[in-house]
Amino acid sequence: MSLVPVVVEQTNRGERSYDIYSRLLKDRIIMLSEEVNDTTASLIVAQLLFLEAEDPDKDIHLYINSPGGSITSGMAIYDTMQYIKPDVSTICVGMAASMGAFLLVAGAKGKRYALPNSEVMIHQPLGGFQGQATDIGIHAERILKMKKKLNTILSDRTGKPLEQVELDTERDHFLSAEEAKEYGLIDEVIDKKK
């Protein structure tokens, strides 16, 4: 069971209490601080769409501290980030690994950040399947297509040649915040809020 802090705000009508994430949402901040799965993807997509409806011209800030997770769930978030009108700024706090790293690089170019002691990890898709040989073949073909798609997007968003991205994602590839900047996964390492 996770504990969610509550903040109390004074208004002219008295006190109002919010869970911390609702309060951050008022400031157009979304937190991805767990595994990427269907539930977290639905929550983040809903928050992105809500904030776009509130003000389509104001940036949204997605803070990421995630070990990664489901490719299809992550692609739902990625596609929504690209679909909506506001720029989505991404900020790595802690670790952005696997699909977490993919979502970090998916932020608006020029607005992708990491705190100084953050880490980023990229790698190829993971998967497992059991069943009949024909079905295993179908799933193996699907994961290879996903690998190609993810690497192509990473190449486009980092400016690295596809061949380099394919080589670097063959195994777990850990990068410090500065290395992530050099690689093109982020645009700037920040230590103070602007």
Swiss-Prot record:
Gene Ontology terms for molecular function: ATP-dependent peptidase activity; ATPase binding; serine-type endopeptidase activity
Q: What Pfam families would the database entry show?
A: CLP_protease (PF00574)
A GO biological process held by the record: protein quality control for misfolded or incompletely synthesized proteins
Q: Which CDD domains match?
A: S14_ClpP_2
**Compartments where found:** Cytoplasm
The main place the protein resides is cytoplasm
User: Looking at the keywords, is Ribosomal protein present?
Assistant: no
| Keyword line | Cytoplasm, Hydrolase, Protease, Serine protease
**What reactions does this protein catalyze?**
Hydrolysis of proteins to small peptides in the presence of ATP and magnesium. alpha-casein is the usual test substrate. In the absence of ATP, only oligopeptides shorter than five residues are hydrolyzed (such as succinyl-Leu-Tyr-|-NHMec, and Leu-Tyr-Leu-|-Tyr-Trp, in which cleavage of the -Tyr-|-Leu- and -Tyr-|-Trp bonds also occurs)
EC number(s) recorded for this UniProt protein: 3.4.21.92
Active-site residue list: S98 (nucleophile), H123
Q: Which GO CC annotations does the UniProt entry carry?
A: cytoplasm; endopeptidase Clp complex
Write out the function statement from the record. Cleaves peptides in various proteins in a process that requires ATP hydrolysis. Has a chymotrypsin-like activity. Plays a major role in the degradation of misfolded proteins.
**What is known about its subunit structure?**
Fourteen ClpP subunits assemble into 2 heptameric rings which stack back to back to give a disk-like structure with a central cavity, resembling the structure of eukaryotic proteasomes.
Family, as annotated: Belongs to the peptidase S14 family.
Q: What is this protein called?
A: ATP-dependent Clp protease proteolytic subunit
Q: Which organism is it from?
A: Clostridium botulinum (strain Loch Maree / Type A3)
